[in-house]
């Protein structure tokens, strides 16, 4: 007897999470892998949009107490396919202002959809130089923006979380 294997799907992962601390501000760079799994290509090319939402949180570590949430930024993007012009369009829905990106290649559109650069979290002057901070990123990808338990079980939505290393603004001696 031959058994049919279920199609493999790519798991949503946060590949690069970089936190940059300089004299002026705290910025974050995030790259999401698997934002457009192969199983969703047919749905996207038939006109159903895919949504990606990044929730970037800046936390302060406090010893022997619960950590304190300092600020949150939400960035939401949409990937839509125009059947007539055969173009993929990536539009920013929330959290950033950028022009609509159009491409005939899904790979290029998926790269623009899943890469977030220079998210400004907080001015450096607003943070205590001796405080220990870290960044937590929660990413969601879903068809038509519907990220529910049923959608995740059906394979049309996924979510993941990743936390950065602990950092401080002052140099350790």
Task: Provide a role label for each language-model segment.
Residues 9-27:
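Short N-terminal segments immediately surrounding and downstream of signal-peptide cleavage
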Residues 3-7:
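N-terminal signal peptide c-region/cleavage motif recognized by signal peptidases
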Residues 12-18, 38, 74-76, 118-123:
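Short structured motifs
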Residues 118-173:
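Glycine-rich, aromatic-bearing surface loops/beta-hairpins
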Residues 28-32, 83, 89, 94-96, ...:
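A beta-strand/beta-hairpin structural motif
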Residues 43-107:
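Structured domain cores in non-transmembrane regions
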């Amino acid at each position: 007897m031959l058994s049919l294997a279920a199609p493999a799907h790519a798991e949503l992962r946060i590949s690069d999470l970089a936190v940059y601390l300089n004299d002026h501000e705290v910025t974050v760079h995030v790259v999401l892998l698997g934002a457009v799994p192969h199983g969703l290509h047919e749905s996207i090319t038939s006109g159903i949009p895919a949504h990606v939402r990044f929730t970037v949180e800046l936390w302060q570590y406090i010893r022997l107490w619960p950590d304190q949430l300092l600020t949150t930024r939400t960035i939401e993007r949409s990937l839509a396919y125009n059947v007539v012009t055969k173009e993929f369009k990536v539009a920013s829905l929330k959290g950033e202002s950028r022009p609509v990106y159009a491409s005939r290649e899904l790979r290029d559109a998926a790269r623009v959809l899943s890469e977030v650069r220079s998210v400004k979290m907080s001015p450096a002057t607003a943070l205590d130089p001796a405080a220990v901070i870290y960044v937590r990123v929660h990413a969601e990808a879903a068809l038509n923006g519907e990220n529910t338990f049923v959608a995740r079980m059906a394979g049309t939505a996924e979510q993941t979380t990743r936390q950065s290393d602990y950092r401080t603004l002052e140099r350790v001696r």
